Amino acid sequence: MREKYILRCTECKNENYIGKNDKKKEKIEVKKFCSNCNKHELHKQKK
């Protein structure tokens, strides 16, 4: 079963991206564009 996750910007704490993945113990960390900060920032998976 695939599980939804939300990526949150580490700078402004804005929730920008939603995705699905297999259930894993590791948290996802990706550098993506934040429309609120208007630049590329590190996004981490919300708890």
Swiss-Prot record:
<comment type="similarity">
    <text>Belongs to the bacterial ribosomal protein bL33 family.</text>
</comment>
<dbReference type="Pfam" id="PF00471">
    <property type="entry name" value="Ribosomal_L33"/>
</dbReference>
<dbReference type="InterPro" id="IPR011332">
    <property type="entry name" value="Ribosomal_zn-bd"/>
</dbReference>
<keyword id="KW-0687">Ribonucleoprotein</keyword>
<dbReference type="GO" id="GO:0005737">
    <property type="term" value="C:cytoplasm"/>
</dbReference>
<dbReference type="GO" id="GO:0006412">
    <property type="term" value="P:translation"/>
</dbReference>
<dbReference type="GO" id="GO:0005840">
    <property type="term" value="C:ribosome"/>
</dbReference>
<dbReference type="GO" id="GO:0003735">
    <property type="term" value="F:structural constituent of ribosome"/>
</dbReference>
<dbReference type="InterPro" id="IPR038584">
    <property type="entry name" value="Ribosomal_bL33_sf"/>
</dbReference>
<dbReference type="InterPro" id="IPR001705">
    <property type="entry name" value="Ribosomal_bL33"/>
</dbReference>
<keyword id="KW-0689">Ribosomal protein</keyword>
<protein>
    <recommendedName>
        <fullName>Large ribosomal subunit protein bL33B</fullName>
    </recommendedName>
</protein>
<dbReference type="GO" id="GO:1990904">
    <property type="term" value="C:ribonucleoprotein complex"/>
</dbReference>
